């Protein structure tokens, strides 16, 4: 495998670590995945905007402690360049509470290569409208792939 391919595998490792830390509600692990810059930003599916690491930490703690979830990537699109990887992902967010309703979310993760590691610089999540979620699920059931 070419050397550059290994670089982008490491970005996927960061994404997987993010999903794991979210499921564990491990705020310290989550924050270790972010770039150490105040320009870091996060937009939640509910529309909340968080700018800067302190605000992101506080927002993650509030949101994940109030409604712990596990995230399952359903469809992943990757766009990369030498120092940046962008993941555009359709995700199923499953609350830890079995009585709570799961949701479908479109999320974009922007990662940058910093000091030999891939770090999250920006996350933008948008709730998937019910009609789109139903179409998405129907295509998945019929084996057409999610974005055909």
Question: What function would you assign to each model-found segment?
Answer:
Residues 23, 91-96, 111-113:
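Beta-strand elements of well-folded, non-transmembrane domains
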Residues 1-33, 42, 139-148:
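Short, low-complexity N-terminal intrinsically disordered segments enriched in polar/charged residues
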Residues 104-138:
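Short beta-strand edge/turn micro-motifs at domain boundaries
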Residues 3, 10, 41-43, 54-100:
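Surface-exposed, charged secondary-structure patches
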Residues 36, 79-82, 114:
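Structural motif
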Residues 3-6, 67-68, 83, 119-121, ...:
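C-terminal-biased regions
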Residues 18, 30-31, 40, 52, ...:
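Hydrophobic pocket/interface hotspot
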